[in-house]
């Protein structure tokens, strides 16, 4: 992968805060031209640095909450198989490999209704095979969320 410079990183940081800015607005913020911004964004997309432009919804207002499921597998080498097993589960929104106490960190999108959320969590936990330990953490409020 080609090395990114300070301008590329600054552009990604600005877009991660507001991806709706126009090329003109970005150019003004970065003291450059629209054409340079367009070329850099095209380059960043081709390199896979920018995967998509999206929004960050207010889950509380939509009636949802997050839960993190922290998993320590008995056989750490089976983490990729576990990822394949759970990747297509509808309410699984993020899967991360961990180094340290947990091999796997999974973010679930759950309804705020605790009975319904409990049912989904229990259903998900049935899919976790070969776990030495599992912890579930319900997220009551997100105080800060930044991508980069």
Curated annotation (Swiss-Prot):
It comes from Pyrococcus abyssi (strain GE5 / Orsay). The keyword Nucleotide-binding does not apply. It holds the Pfam family HTH_24. SMART domains: HTH_ASNC (SM00344). Keywords: DNA-binding, Transcription, Transcription regulation. Residues 4-65 form the HTH asnC-type domain. GO terms for molecular function: sequence-specific DNA binding. InterPro entries: AsnC-type_HTH_dom, Dimeric_a/b-barrel, HTH-Siroheme_Decarb, Tscrpt_reg_AsnC-like, Tscrpt_reg_HTH_AsnC-type_CS, WH-like_DNA-bd_sf, WH_DNA-bd_sf. It comes from the Archaea. The keyword Metal-binding does not apply. This is Uncharacterized HTH-type transcriptional regulator PYRAB00690. Residues 23-42 bind DNA.
């Amino acid at each position: 992968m080609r090395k990114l410079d300070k301008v590329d990183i600054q552009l990604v940081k600005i877009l991660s805060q507001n991806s709706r800015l126009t090329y003109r607005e970005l150019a003004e913020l970065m003291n450059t031209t629209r054409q340079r911004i367009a070329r850099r964004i095209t380059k960043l997309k081709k390199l896979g640095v920018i995967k998509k432009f999206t929004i960050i919804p207010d889950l509380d207002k939509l009636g949802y909450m997050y839960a993190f499921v922290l998993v320590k597998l008995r056989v750490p080498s089976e983490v990729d198989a576990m990822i394949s097993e759970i990747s297509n589960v509808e309410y699984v929104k993020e899967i991360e490999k961990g180094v340290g106490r947990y091999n796997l960190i999974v973010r679930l999108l759950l309804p705020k209704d605790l009975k319904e959320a409990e049912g989904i969590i229990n259903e998900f936990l049935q899919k976790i095979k070969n776990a030495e330990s599992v912890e579930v953490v319900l997220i009551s409020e997100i105080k800060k969320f930044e991508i980069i």
